[in-house]
Structures are given as C-alpha cells and as structure tokens.
C-alpha cells in the first residue's frame, strides 16, 4: 500500500486484505455500506496522512447532521444518523486506521482519541407469564404458535428458530420419557447481500436458498452462528416436545399432499410449500 494514498483507496485495500478474511457476510455488508454511504462521500478523497484529530472531530460533527441513506428499499426511521450508527462508523474507522498504523501507512491512529456517542440502551421489556399465556392462547397460526413456544420455552432468537431443522430435534418416545428431549442449535437463518456472498465465498454458509425473484440484491441463507458459544443443546419441556411432534405430523401430511410441489429443506418452521 503506498504511503501517499487516499482514505477511499486505503479502505478498498482494508476491505480486501482485512475484511474479507475477518468478517462474515453480515458484517461485510454492513461495513461496506457504511464506507460507501457515510465515509467515502465525506473524507474519501483526503490523503490518509491528512486525517488528523481535528479532521476526525469535524467528521464526527458532520455525521451528527447526516441524513440516513435508504437501505434495501427500507426508508430510514430517523431524520439524522442515530448515535448507534455513528458509533458503528467510528468503530469501523478506528479498526481501519489501526491497520494503517500496523501497515506503516500512518504513524498514529487519530480515531483513538474520539469519544464515542452516548448510546441509550433501552431495557428489554420482559413478558410476564400471564402475557405469554395470553399471546399463546390468542395465536391462531400453527406455525407461529410453534415459533412462539420455541422462543418462550427455549429462549431462542428468531434466526435460530427459523434455521432449526428436524435432524436437530430429538423428540422420540424414549427422549421424552427420560426428560431428554432437546434441540441442537448449530445454524441460523438470515438474509445476506448477494455481493457479500460472492466476495467472501460460502464461508460459514451451509445453504443459499434460490430466490423467487432472481434480480434481488439479497439471498436467504443458512449459516453458522456468529460465535461458537451460540452452538448449544437446549432441553425441551415435555409440553413443547409434544407440540413439536404434532407439528411434524401435520407438516408430513401436507408434504404428502403436495408431493413434488413441497420444497423439503427439513425446516421446522417453514411456509406451507416448505420454503423459509
């Protein structure tokens, strides 16, 4: 990397030399979007050596006045960038400039001296047993009922529920009788950008679902969880084990009825045609 290089050119090298090795598809999509939408338009043409602490402070001020860019067709919910998004931009640049120091492009990291914005972490609302019971009693959709039970009884996240496959569900008579019924969480379902998948290859991706509309910029994928600690065995209460058995039975009946029209991905929570 030349010592006299612009921020834009350096970040391009940073993404290809560092990001493609270290980031998963979600992080790659997020970080490249931050670079394209908020970093390059503001400081991309500057020389790396010209980015001093005062430049960083001015850039920070500019971010606070910046309008969010529409993402994947979704309109922004706020008029200005949120502190959480500004924090993401600054952390990304801090990481990039740290590599610039390591690669001897610059002598020191001007982003080390930035005070990150105060991000208000709203406490999660915890549902009471009564609210959970009411929600389950009022649920008329069998698929949603199964998903809600997995969320409440097993504390599974949405991606984990949608990525759960029957081969990881242990609900035999013997399992239930011995209080040994469980699900094994080793993957999650998420949506990733097509460009990120093409750039990174299928690292940590188990399956890419064929899109219904081929020209879309994203793909639904089954992937390895972000951290190894997320891979775990979760025990099932007997009531939920029986709910899952009934759901499997009805899913198999539908599969038999639809025949070849059913797209069998072995998903526990799937659309009537088997797709996620």
Map each language-model feature to its residues:
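N-terminal DNA-binding module of tyrosine recombinases/phage integrases
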Residues: 1-54, 247-264, 270, 274
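Non-catalytic DNA-binding core/recognition domains of DNA-processing enzymes
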Residues: 11, 22-41, 56-57, 74, ...
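Conserved hydrophobic/aromatic pocket- or pore-lining residues that grip, position, or stack substrates
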Residues: 39, 56, 93-96, 104, ...
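Short glycine-enriched loop/turn motifs at secondary-structure junctions
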Residues: 41, 118-120, 225-230, 270
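Short, conserved phosphate-binding/catalytic loop or strand-edge motifs used
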Residues: 49-64, 112-117
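Short basic/aromatic active-site micro-motif
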Residues: 51, 84, 88, 275-276
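Basic, Lys/Arg- and aromatic-enriched nucleic-acid-binding interface segment
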Residues: 69-83, 87-89, 102, 106-166, ...
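Conserved tyrosine-mediated DNA breakage-rejoining catalytic core shared by Y-recombinases
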Residues: 115-116, 130-131, 164-253, 257-263
């Amino acid at each position: 990397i030349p010592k006299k290089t612009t921020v834009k050119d350096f970040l391009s090298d940073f993404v290809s030399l560092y990001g493609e090795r270290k980031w998963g598809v979600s992080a790659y999509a997020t970080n490249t979007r931050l670079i394209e939408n908020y970093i390059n338009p503001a400081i991309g043409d500057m020389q790396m050596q010209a980015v001093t602490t005062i430049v960083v402070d001015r850039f920070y001020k500019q971010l606070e006045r910046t309008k969010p860019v529409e993402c994947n067709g979704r309109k922004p919910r706020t008029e200005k960038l949120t502190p959480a998004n500004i924090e993401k931009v600054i952390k990304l640049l801090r990481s990039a400039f740290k590599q610039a120091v390591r690669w001897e492009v610059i002598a020191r990291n001007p982003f080390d001296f930035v005070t990150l914005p105060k991000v208000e972490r709203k406490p999660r609302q915890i549902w009471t047993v009564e609210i959970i019971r009411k929600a389950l009693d009022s649920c008329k959709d069998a698929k949603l009922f199964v998903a809600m039970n997995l969320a409440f009884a097993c504390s599974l996240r949405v991606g984990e529920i949608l990525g759960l496959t029957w081969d990881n569900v242990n609900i035999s008579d013997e399992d239930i009788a011995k209080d040994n019924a469980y699900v094994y969480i080793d993957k999650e379902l998420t949506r990733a950008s097509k460009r990120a998948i093409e750039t990174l290859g299928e690292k940590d991706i188990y399956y890419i679902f064929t899109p219904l509309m081929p020209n879309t910029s994203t793909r639904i994928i089954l992937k390895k969880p972000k951290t190894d600690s997320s891979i775990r065995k979760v025990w099932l209460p007997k009531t939920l084990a029986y709910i899952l058995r009934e759901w499997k039975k009805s899913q198999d009946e539908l599969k038999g009825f639809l025949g070849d029209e059913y797209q069998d991905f072995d998903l526990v929570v799937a659309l009537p045609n088997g797709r996620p």
